[in-house]
């Protein structure tokens, strides 16, 4: 059973503390293989989802300013994000659906969450509009990015709770976990 409402065609995930968590103390994101593990419970929560052709489309939207600061390359960031998605969902998203901001935290760019740029890029890649898109994240910047992009938002903690209850809400639900106007 999918934990997502039936109107969803595209699920965009944040990466850190949503799909994966860092295993290196005092490091906010992984810089290489072996420095992360799947977020506990997320793999099980997504086990009933069919991804790819005939199923849901997937994207990733992640702030990766560690590229700007020289801690990892853009290629490594892309690989680690795709590896995390595959480890958690069993499906490797197409590279064009994996979007990240490599700018400095204070760059003021249009892509760094809470700006909506990364979400819009993932939707454009898949040809899916905001009304059929859900963004799953863990932070207030994720919620704000979803609102600014006009897409529904689901907190990862609510995803885990929903997966246990197996009762997806309807579109326009008053539930705080999936709401167009959060």
Model regions and ranges:
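Asp-based, Mg2+/Mn2+-dependent phosphohydrolase catalytic module
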Residues: 1-13, 75-97, 106-135, 139-182
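Active-site neighborhood of HAD-like aspartate-dependent phosphohydrolases
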Residues: 1-57
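Active-site loop/turn elements of alpha/beta-hydrolase fold enzymes
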Residues: 15, 22-24, 63-64, 103, ...
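Ser/Thr-centric signal marking residues that sit
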Residues: 18, 62, 133
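Short, active-site-adjacent cap segments at secondary-structure transitions
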Residues: 18-20, 65-69, 106, 142-143
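Short, flexible/disordered intra-domain loops and linkers
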Residues: 26-31, 69-77, 107-110
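Substrate-recognition element of Asp-dependent hydrolases with the DxDx(T/V) motif
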Residues: 42-84, 95-104
């Amino acid at each position: 059973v999918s934990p997502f409402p039936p109107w969803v065609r595209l699920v965009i995930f944040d990466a850190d503390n949503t799909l994966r968590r860092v295993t290196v103390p005092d490091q906010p994101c992984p810089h290489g293989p072996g420095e992360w593990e799947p977020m506990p419970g997320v793999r099980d929560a997504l086990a009933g989802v069919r991804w790819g052709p005939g199923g849901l489309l997937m994207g990733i939207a992640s702030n990766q300013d560690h590229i700007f600061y020289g801690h990892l390359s853009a290629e490594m960031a892309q690989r680690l994000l795709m590896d995390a998605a595959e480890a958690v969902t069993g499906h490797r998203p197409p590279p064009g659906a994996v979007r990240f901001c490599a700018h400095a935290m204070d760059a003021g760019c249009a892509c760094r969450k809470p700006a909506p740029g990364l979400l819009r890029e993932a939707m454009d890649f898949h040809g899916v509009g905001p009304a059929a898109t859900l963004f799953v994240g863990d932070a207030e910047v994720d919620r704000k990015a979803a609102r600014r992009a006009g897409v529904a938002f689901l907190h990862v903690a609510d995803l885990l709770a929903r997966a246990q209850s197996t009762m997806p809400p309807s579109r326009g639900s008053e539930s705080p976990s999936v709401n167009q106007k959060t």
